[in-house]
Amino acid sequence: MKHTHIQKIKLIAPFLLPGFIAFCIFTVIPIVLAIGLAFTNYSGGIAWKFVGLRNFITAFRSEAFFKGLAVTARYMIYTVVFQIIIGLGCALMLYRPFRGFTVFRSILYIPNILSSVAVGLAFMLIFEPTNGIVNSLLVSVGMMPSKFLAGESTALSVIIGVTVWQNFGWYMILFIGGLQSINPFLYEAARIDGAGSIKQFFSITLPGLSPVLFYAVTIAVIRGFQVFDYIFIMTGGQFGGGPAGSTSVLAFDIYKNAFVNYRFGYASAEAVILMIIIVAITVIQQHGQKKWVSYDIV
């Protein structure tokens, strides 16, 4: 038995080894290096000095750090809510076959396969405050133009809208798979018992979707905290995050401190704090899985 087990390991190991090596090179080693840099004053070159917790203390005393964290939290909450709601709504309309349903699914999913850089550039031109398409249309019908990406109160909302538009199709496909896995006889039995559509949704659909819903929310939360590309592209590259820091999420603040200000040690400390926040939220979600997720609906 032991000999057979060793043979299986020898058979599987060559296939797992490349992936394991890549994981170590591109994930484990960078994380370890970032944690190490967080305790130094490294600013490039070969000179560095161990500073203990100074970078972390500086971060917790920094107004920019907490503002970035607040902007990140706002972005994350809105994108999670709207992506899940819109994705679930579209899935409920499209999971049953009807004439042309595959066309509608494809149209709604296409934005997700586009490059976020291309999407960001396109919408930056569309919402350009001076000569953008949207403002041109508003002026043509006698309405006042909006600042959009140049407005402190509107810039983040535009970026949230673009994020939701590009990504809700992915969640839709995820929910369609979950809906199709629910036993249709449960709905038939519920109808016989006199249950209406709303009661069926809360008694069968939502519990049956809870494993997929839990996974979708977890992924959406992690993506929300990690956002960088839309901010970088749509607000002015390395000098972006404006206006007045209204779109400067924590990941973008980390980028600026590292690659614009060359404060690699401090940026690493911010990155470690962000990693701890994401891990903590994920652990809380996983801990609550027993309460929120139902595996009884088949």
PLM region spans:
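A structural signal for multi-pass alpha-helical bundles of membrane permease subunits
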Residues: T4-V298
